Amino acid sequence: MTGLRGDQVTDLVGGVFDLLDGVWQPVRGRRRALGLYRAVVLTLFLMRRNEAQAVAGELFGCSQSTVSRVVRRLRPLLRQVTADFAGQIRQQAKRSAVLVDGFLAPTGNRAGVSDLFSGKRHAAGLNIQAVSDLAGRLVDTGLPVPGARHDSKALTESGIADRWANHLKPAGPGMLADLGYLGTGANTGWRGRLTDFPEILRTVTGLEIYRIWG
């Protein structure tokens, strides 16, 4: 339901409880419909599944308005609880090469909001720049930008280029990307003649073996 292990959920509930100074239920007046544990699980469920709040209310035995209040209260607290851990993972990832790519978070067409339609993906949404380690594990995301933005521009506008600036330098750890990131400083793959590639690969392999074992 949440995508997290039971012990991870328990730790998050404990972190939220601490931020609330140990007080979830009001001292006076009407009690909350959900205890803190179920309220956190509800919020995690919606963050993972993006279901309608009315559907979540049916599943958790409460009204849509209760769901809305719970999510508004707990979502920023969950961000606070995970902030330090996420920062530590980012710092570890900055020691080696990373991958970057953009994906479209669908929004549908919104009145009065321009530049949402992505010609590349043939849908309206927000362009999210995501950074992972070489094993594909997420380590960072940028601020959402309109879906019409090309990835090379979104890299800068999202703040990722600034936060990972050292990886975009010639002597940096390296940021691997597809050809949509040409001109950003990211390593965008082989663009020379394919007939030359086998020899280049063997040379690079030999040099790397020499570096490690020589």
Residue ranges, per PLM feature:
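Basic, low-complexity segments
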Residues: 1-33, 185
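Short, flexible segments with low predicted structural confidence
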Residues: 13, 26-29, 38-41, 64, ...
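Hydrophobic face of alpha-helices
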Residues: 13, 68-71
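Glycine-/proline-rich flexible loop or hinge segments
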Residues: 23-28, 50-57
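Glycine-rich, flexible loop segments associated with nucleotide phosphate handling
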Residues: 34-38, 171-174
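Short, amphipathic alpha-helical "recognition" segments used to contact nucleic acids or chromatin
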Residues: 35-50
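Short, well-ordered secondary-structure "scaffold" segments embedded in the functional core
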Residues: 55-69, 76-80, 84-214
